[in-house]
């Protein structure tokens, strides 16, 4: 059985731990808990192929910049995450996370993930953004960033509603076990462009 190591990175509070907890337990943590997710391993079936999936959470805060890369060796696929309601986390994809990941793992597969997509329609979140003269990031902005960092694809999900959540992990697994898939064909025919 093939083993896959998946590491999740991104700014603090973009929802990395919630993404992992929601995926592995089908429940959403109700309070913010900075990185308490233990490494998790499970057998997962994707396209009639069973793989042993190892999930690794990381702390996004600067305090952990020197420790975080210790979890990178032997990584098969990274999920670089940003919150669709945080311009700063989006900007940091290119200025911090992509350079860090590609420095330590130059040939690794990257999936860019826009988290908290449920908040694109949330009145309270939209009002807070309006007060700062901002708006949620668009799917097209995510796709553009994915092209710029040469990510395998861009996907969006919500750990709260689980919309697109399973598809993110399925796509990450497929990107590793079927590396020769034509990306152009993949973008047209797969679940990679989920809203």
From Swiss-Prot:
Subcellular location: Cell membrane
This protein's GO CC annotations: cell projection; cytoplasm; cytoplasmic vesicle; cytoskeleton; lipid droplet; plasma membrane
A GO term for molecular function: protein kinase binding
Entry superkingdom: Eukaryota
The UniProt record lists the keyword Mitochondrion: no
Residues reported to bind GTP: 10-17, 57-61, 115-118
Residue positions of motif Effector region: 32-40
Cysteine methyl ester PTM positions: 192
Prosegment location in residue numbers: 193-195
Keywords: Cell membrane, GTP-binding, Lipoprotein, Membrane, Methylation, Nucleotide-binding, Prenylation
Lipid-carrying residues in chain (S-geranylgeranyl cysteine): 192
Record SUPFAM superfamilies: P-loop containing nucleoside triphosphate hydrolases
One GO BP annotation of this record: actin filament polymerization
Membrane topology: Lipid-anchor
PANTHER family recorded: RHO FAMILY GTPASE (PTHR24072)
NCBIfam families for this protein: small_GTP
Family: Belongs to the small GTPase superfamily. Rho family.
Subunit architecture: Interacts with pakB.
Protein name: Rho-related protein racB
Record organism: Dictyostelium discoideum (Social amoeba)
Source taxonomy: Eukaryota, Amoebozoa, Evosea, Eumycetozoa, Dictyostelia
């Amino acid at each position: 059985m093939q083993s896959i190591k998946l590491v999740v990175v991104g700014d603090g509070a973009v929802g990395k731990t919630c993404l992992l907890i929601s995926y592995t337990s089908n429940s959403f943590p109700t309070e913010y808990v900075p990185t308490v997710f233990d490494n998790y391993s499970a057998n997962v079936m994707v396209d009639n192929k069973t793989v042993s999936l190892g999930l690794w959470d990381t702390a996004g805060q600067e305090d952990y910049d020197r420790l975080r890369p210790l979890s990178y060796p032997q990584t098969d696929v990274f999920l670089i995450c940003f919150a669709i309601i945080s311009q700063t986390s989006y900007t940091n994809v290119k200025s911090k996370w992509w350079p860090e990941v590609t420095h330590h793992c130059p040939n690794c597969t990257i999936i860019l993930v826009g988290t908290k997509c449920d908040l694109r329609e949330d009145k309270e979140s939209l009002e807070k953004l309006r007060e700062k003269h901002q708006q949620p990031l668009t799917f097209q902005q995510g796709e553009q960033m994915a092209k710029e960092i040469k990510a395998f694809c861009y996907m969006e999900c919500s750990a709260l509603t689980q919309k697109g959540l399973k598809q993110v992990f399925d796509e990450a697994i497929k990107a590793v076990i079927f590396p020769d898939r034509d990306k152009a064909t993949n973008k047209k025919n797969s679940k990679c462009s989920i809203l």
